[in-house]
């Protein structure tokens, strides 16, 4: 009787151990919406002669973008400024969702729009301490350029973004160091 129980337990144990090997492999995930993505990262830095916390107080609110990008209108259309999930609208059309933050940084993403190829655009603005009295602003962009025609178009797009955001970093430096920006040019 005892040997029958031992044999039954051994058989059950063997079946349990073999079950995962006999289980069906999980189904393959559905294909990617963009199967041949061409992700790029554009990282720009600007030295600032102020402590990081002081810099962040000047340029780090989610809609401060309107102050350091002259002529750009920013409004919070969902959530609360500075809280995860807050949505800002730029110039009445571009939406950006606050998806991550630290005491001296935030990251945003642009949502998917119907009828447009999604480029997975994300941006991060950070005030990074360098010394007790100095810091640097770091602006990082990550996006997919696969919808652009060729390498020349991708290079042009990256250079355009780098130029625009490098100017924004210079303007943030000016404001953080106590300066004022010139009013936007008349259109």
Briefly describe each language-model feature range.
Residues 113-167:
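Beta-strand/loop substructures that line and gate deep hydrophobic ligand-binding cavities in soluble
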Residues 1-11:
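Bacterial N-terminal signal peptides that target proteins for export
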Residues 47, 64-70, 74-122, 136, ...:
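Glycine-rich portal/gate segments that line the openings of hydrophobic small-molecule binding cavities
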């Amino acid at each position: 009787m005892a040997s029958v129980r031992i044999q039954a337990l051994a058989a059950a144990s063997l079946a349990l151990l073999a079950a995962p090997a006999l289980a069906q492999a999980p189904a393959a995930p559905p294909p990617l919406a963009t199967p041949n993505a061409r992700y790029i990262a554009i990282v720009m830095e600007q030295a600032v002669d102020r402590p990081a916390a002081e810099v962040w107080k000047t340029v780090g609110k989610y809609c401060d973008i309107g102050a350091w990008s002259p002529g750009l209108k920013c409004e919070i259309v969902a959530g609360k400024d500075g809280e995860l999930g807050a949505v800002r609208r730029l110039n009445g059309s571009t939406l950006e969702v606050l998806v991550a933050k630290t005491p001296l940084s935030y990251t945003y993403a642009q949502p998917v729009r119907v009828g447009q190829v999604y480029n997975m655009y994300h941006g991060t603005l950070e005030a990074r301490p360098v010394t007790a009295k100095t810091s640097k602003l770091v602006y990082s962009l990550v996006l997919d350029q696969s919808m652009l025609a060729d390498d020349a178009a991708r290079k042009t797009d990256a250079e355009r973004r780098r130029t625009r955001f490098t100017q924004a970093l210079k303007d943030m430096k000016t404001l953080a160091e106590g300066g004022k920006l010139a009013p936007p040019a008349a259109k």
